[in-house]
Amino acid sequence: MLYGLSAEQDMIAQTVRSFVEKEIYPHEELVERTGEVPNEIAQQIKEKTLELGFYACNFPQSVGCAGLSHVDFALVERELGRGSMALNHFFGRPQNILMACQGEQIDRYLMPAVRGERMDALAMTEPGAGSDIRGMKCSAQRNGGDWVVNGSKHFISGADHADFFIVFIATGEDQTDKGPKKRITAFLVDRGTPGFSVRDGYKSVSHRGYKNMILEFDDCRLPQAQVLGEVDGGFEVMNTWLYATRITVATMSVGRARRVFDYALSYAAEREQFGQKIGKFQGVSFQLADMITEIDAADLLTLAAADRLDKALPSNREIASAKLYASEMLARVTDAAIQIHGGMGLMSDYPLERFWRDARVERIWDGTSEIQRHIISRDLLRALGA
């Protein structure tokens, strides 16, 4: 148990780790080979998560969920990070932006999502708007009492299984000293809505089976009732979601790095060269020491950022630091593990080459490493009035 965690928190982590080992690991090879998660396996994972009481555990008790703190939820995500993203998607963590649902939206979207009856996906990124989210082209124009949407989104994770989507769309533009500034609104869009389609996206080397899809809007008419939150208030909602998601990326990177390290440590303790275990050679032993030190440091950095969220303290810089360090740490750890395994580490008969491929995307999605460095330095300079 790491410093500062209670016995109850340690039990949460152990419970989820056991779940991943029993319910996720056995199916990973199939998903890696086929690029698909069979419906029966997805349903099985979802049902067992509901039985455990962990489904939508990031939602408050007021909607019948576990109401875990940010630290507790980070522990859950850390252990889920050990397993396949394609499979642990069905562990069920709906976007907590849904807490902004009002009126009929609560019964149509929020409650079915937290009960596991409907799955959601969040759509923000566009072909020309990744890090520059205000550069989005997907737009909605008022037409009578409705909104008419045109444009597209891409790299949308979980869209293949989603029943509805939370889509961020430009709904206006303001002129500022720095040029045009888009106003953004969040919309709830049901699969099958006329003028809205979901199609296959790109083939990725990372996280096979965890598909990214393309959403297209062609004069798609959405009533005002589909607006989530306030009109033109989507950017603030999106920013809040992004920072919370960056903690998830950081803590899942820690979990994945621990699994990779376990492989490397076991191999170093068993593999013999020149008449002794390779772990006894200084070169390998120092690599192992560096790996575990970086993993523990990333873990503590991430939990500290989550703790600041729980205490409602300013945390943007701390979250950016955690995401930056943990995602880059994962890359270093997976690379070192490959080196320790030598040629065997690159063979697809073993999981290390998969972990190596999967690690690459963590430095890109939900805010690139460069964006995190920008946030960190910006906050440091702002504190000095610069």
Stretches found by the model and what they are:
Residues 53, 76-81, 169-170, 189-194, ...:
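Short Ser/Thr-interspersed hydrophobic loop/turn segments at strand-loop and sheet-helix junctions
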Residues 68-69, 132-134, 158-162, 178-182, ...:
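Short glycine/proline-enriched turns and hinge-like loops at secondary-structure junctions
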Residues 93-102:
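Helix-loop "lid/cap" segments that line or gate small-molecule binding pockets
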Residues 116-124, 168:
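A short, Trp-centered hydrophobic/proline-enriched beta-strand micro-motif
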Residues 137-139:
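Short, surface-exposed charged micro-motifs
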